[in-house]
């Protein structure tokens, strides 16, 4: 079997009805959601299957839902005798999914932790004052320059380096709008405002990170059974304090996804499996390293194909 890695998606990959087909085939999916529901005090499976979407899309509910979906798929993989990946990585919230699957954080602890992470993020910025935009077709340096020149005393910066030519910026809503216009003037094909209420991974998230650090200190961290590439430094940490520190800094620093995928490829990995709903990371992979292949493990046929590789 070729060397493979598991990657875990972040916010934006959720949808009402996600994993329904997997749950119909593998009871462990609903069992995993039942565990999460017990930790949270509400029926998370009902929310993911019935919605409404505006509830599922609230960040403090999105985050536990995506984490649980990824852990459920990982458990299906293990139950079916799937081999261990060479590496793991997750995009933003997905880093928590990776750490659970690598045995670093207990699942119930992680579910409660990411719910709090979502609440802290929402509390850090008053509703309607933050924004995010995807900048398509402009180099990283030009985007950084546009952000610097558009700040005017407010916060705006690149926050997700998703693939070459696809970078997300975040900060104060007006500054994001100015920077988007500056990026277009500098040659960007598009500046797409994203329908989010929280400007993730920018300096406005520092108060949320400080609160998160307090909660992270209460949780036991174990050594990873599989190396996890972190978002903030593109490193595989084994020490609990270093993993905690990277999670705190992740909240107000950019997600280095392009570099993470390049790092994974440099370790001899040839295929990425996306473990979670949607196919966002699968779509980004080829744009980052064209020799890498990728596929999503969220449907029974795709899972069966992967298990027979």
From Swiss-Prot:
Q: Which residues form the active site?
A: 92, 201
* Entry keyword Membrane: no
A Pfam family matched in the record = Acyl_transf_1
Give the GO cellular component terms, alphabetically: cytosol
PANTHER family listed in its UniProt record: MALONYL-COA-ACYL CARRIER PROTEIN TRANSACYLASE, MITOCHONDRIAL
This chain's protein is named Malonyl CoA-acyl carrier protein transacylase
Catalysed reaction, written as an equation? holo-[ACP] + malonyl-CoA = malonyl-[ACP] + CoA
* The family this protein is said to belong to: Belongs to the FabD family.
**NCBIfam families documented for this protein:** fabD
Species of the source: Salmonella typhimurium (strain LT2 / SGSC1412 / ATCC 700720)
- In the record, what terms sit under GO molecular function? [acyl-carrier-protein] S-malonyltransferase activity
Give the EC number(s) listed in the UniProt record.
2.3.1.39
| Organism placement in taxonomy | Bacteria, Pseudomonadati, Pseudomonadota, Gammaproteobacteria, Enterobacterales
Top-level EC class as recorded in UniProt? transferase
């Amino acid at each position: 079997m070729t060397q493979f890695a598991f990657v875990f998606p972040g916010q934006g990959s959720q949808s009402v009805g996600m994993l329904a087909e997997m749950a119909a085939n593998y009871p462990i999916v609903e069992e995993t959601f039942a565990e999460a529901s017990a930790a949270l005090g509400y029926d998370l499976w009902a929310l993911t299957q019935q919605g409404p979407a505006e509830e599922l899309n609230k960040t403090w509910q999105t985050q536990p839902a995506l984490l649980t979906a990824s852990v459920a798929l990982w458990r299906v993989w293990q139950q079916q005798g799937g081999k261990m990946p060479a590496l793991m990585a997750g995009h933003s919230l997905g880093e928590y999914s990776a750490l659970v699957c690598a045995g670093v954080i207990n699942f119930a602890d992680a579910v409660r932790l990411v719910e709090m992470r979502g609440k802290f993020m929402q509390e850090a910025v008053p509703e309607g004052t933050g924004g995010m935009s995807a900048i398509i077709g402009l180099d990283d340096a030009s985007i950084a320059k546009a952000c610097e020149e558009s700040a005017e005393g407010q916060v705006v910066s690149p926050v997700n380096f998703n693939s070459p030519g696809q970078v997300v910026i975040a900060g104060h809503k007006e500054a994001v709008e100015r920077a988007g216009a500056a990026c277009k003037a500098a040659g960007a094909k598009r500046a797409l405002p994203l329908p989010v209420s929280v400007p993730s991974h920018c300096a406005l998230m520092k108060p949320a990170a400080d609160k998160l650090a307090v909660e992270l200190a209460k949780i036991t961290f174990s050594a990873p059974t599989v190396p996890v590439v972190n978002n903030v430094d593109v490193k595989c940490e084994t020490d609990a304090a270093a993993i905690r520190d990277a999670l705190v800094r992740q909240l107000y620093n950019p997600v280095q996804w392009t570099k993470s995928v390049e790092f994974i490829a440099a370790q001899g990995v040839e295929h990425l499996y996306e473990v979670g709903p949607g196919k966002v990371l699968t779509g980004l992979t080829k744009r980052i390293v064209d020799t890498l292949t990728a596929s999503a493990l969220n449907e029974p046929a795709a899972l069966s194909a992967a298990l027979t590789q």
